[in-house]
Amino acid sequence: MKNNYDILIIGGGPAGALAAKTAAEAGNTVCLIEKRAAIGTPVRCAEGIGKELLKEFIKPDPRWIAADIERARIISPNGTAISLEQDRAGNEVGYVLDRKIFDRELVWQAAEAGADVIVKTRATAPIMENGAVRGAKVLSVGIPADIRAEVVIAADGTEAQFARRAGLDTVVPLREMMSCAQYLMTDIDIDAGSTDFYLGNEIAPEGYLWVFPKGNRTANVGIGISGRKSRDGSRAKDYLDRFVAKNFPNGKTIEAIAGGVPVCRPLACTVADGLMVAGDAARVVDPITGGGIGNAMYTGRLAAQVASKCIAAGDCSKEALMPYDAEWRASKMGTVLERNYKVKEYFVTLDDAKLNTLAESIAQSSLKEFSVLGLIKELIKRNPKLLLELKALKDTLS
């Protein structure tokens, strides 16, 4: 193992992989470390991503596309379904990936670009000098070592331990940490071309339940509920088990995962001296959908681009790295995150009766676009009083 690099990347998910590939292609010496023994496992994601968004970063490949989705459905507590076909659903209809293969492909591309990839290596603490991050102390297959770098990109997922140890505030309020559970199920009867989202406080309080098909009568069936709603007998797994017993009584569960997804605002600042934070660690998960693959790839790539310029200029201070933070906040992604956070804060206050009323009002509508923005516009069109309740969003809905 070498001990000095231009850029050290912590985490082998989509954010880390795109950062490593981009940084290596720019001519930097790059090391990507991953704490697990294998890239892409365990899968901690529903595995969905919009088609156009994916194509911004990688050419789709049948090897890691489990299903090509034709429509999306939102199903209210009383069963009213809002169905969006592919020609109107835009970026929300897309692919269901096989993350085990997809993540490995991304890291493989980073390695081909010249990045060193080291698995079973955990960053235990930042190397700090005069208040700046200068690398990481690691345990590699149980052996301690130091890896020094001009810039560290922390892409270590929801836990965001490295950024916290470097002094950034990464705490997520309990109510904004979704408690999630997911089963990979087979031998179930589903619409193989539709991603389904179920709403309702009896189904998934302050969250939603999803069914994402993966072909051959197989699907990811999962749920996310507010952390403050999770308690004995009412955990995410309990709600999921009840849904499965009712809807897929003869299905077979071949894999189960559990975890948390932050649906808060992004970190107040995603840079420090010698440090950048990307992906889920930066809290750039969509607050409504909980999706984060595309945002992770975007922030990982952007972090590497800015880091490369700073290294070339010989200045990796917080001030020099700040264009990364400013650019993603000013981007379409940053705008959507802020708007969707406000929408999420409103919708978690609704009871099932209000959810049913809103769904029924647009169930037969022909939406011009299927996105959170398109959905809110149509809801306001059908329910004008809603604009008063969403007055904080007025300027973003034009």
Curated annotation (Swiss-Prot):
Keywords: FAD, Flavoprotein, Lipid biosynthesis, Lipid metabolism, Oxidoreductase, Phospholipid biosynthesis, Phospholipid metabolism. Signal peptide: none annotated. One of its GO terms (cellular component) is membrane. Its EC number is 1.3.7.11. Binds 1 FAD per subunit. One of its GO terms (biological process) is membrane lipid biosynthetic process. Gene3D superfamilies: D-Amino Acid Oxidase, subunit A, domain 2, FAD/NAD(P)-binding domain. One of its GO terms (molecular function) is flavin adenine dinucleotide binding. Its cofactor is FAD. It catalyses: a 2,3-bis-O-phytanyl-sn-glycerol 1-phospholipid + 8 oxidized 2[4Fe-4S]-[ferredoxin] = a 2,3-bis-O-(geranylgeranyl)-sn-glycerol 1-phospholipid + 8 reduced 2[4Fe-4S]-[ferredoxin] + 16 H(+); 2,3-bis-O-(phytanyl)-sn-glycerol 1-phosphate + 8 oxidized 2[4Fe-4S]-[ferredoxin] = 2,3-bis-O-(geranylgeranyl)-sn-glycerol 1-phosphate + 8 reduced 2[4Fe-4S]-[ferredoxin] + 16 H(+); a 2,3-bis-O-phytanyl-sn-glycerol 1-phospholipid + 8 A = a 2,3-bis-O-(geranylgeranyl)-sn-glycerol 1-phospholipid + 8 AH2; CDP-2,3-bis-O-(geranylgeranyl)-sn-glycerol + 8 AH2 = CDP-2,3-bis-O-(phytanyl)-sn-glycerol + 8 A. FAD binds at residues 15, 34, 45-46, 48, 99, 123, 280, 292-293. Pathway: Membrane lipid metabolism; glycerophospholipid metabolism. A 2,3-bis-O-(geranylgeranyl)-sn-glycerol 1-phospholipid binds at residue 372. Belongs to the geranylgeranyl reductase family. DGGGPL reductase subfamily. Reduction reaction proceeds via syn addition of hydrogen for double bonds. HAMAP family: DGGGPL_reductase. Is involved in the reduction of 2,3-digeranylgeranylglycerophospholipids (unsaturated archaeols) into 2,3-diphytanylglycerophospholipids (saturated archaeols) in the biosynthesis of archaeal membrane lipids. Catalyzes the formation of archaetidic acid (2,3-di-O-phytanyl-sn-glyceryl phosphate) from 2,3-di-O-geranylgeranylglyceryl phosphate (DGGGP) via the hydrogenation of each double bond of the isoprenoid chains. This is Digeranylgeranylglycerophospholipid reductase. It comes from Methanoculleus marisnigri (strain ATCC 35101 / DSM 1498 / JR1).
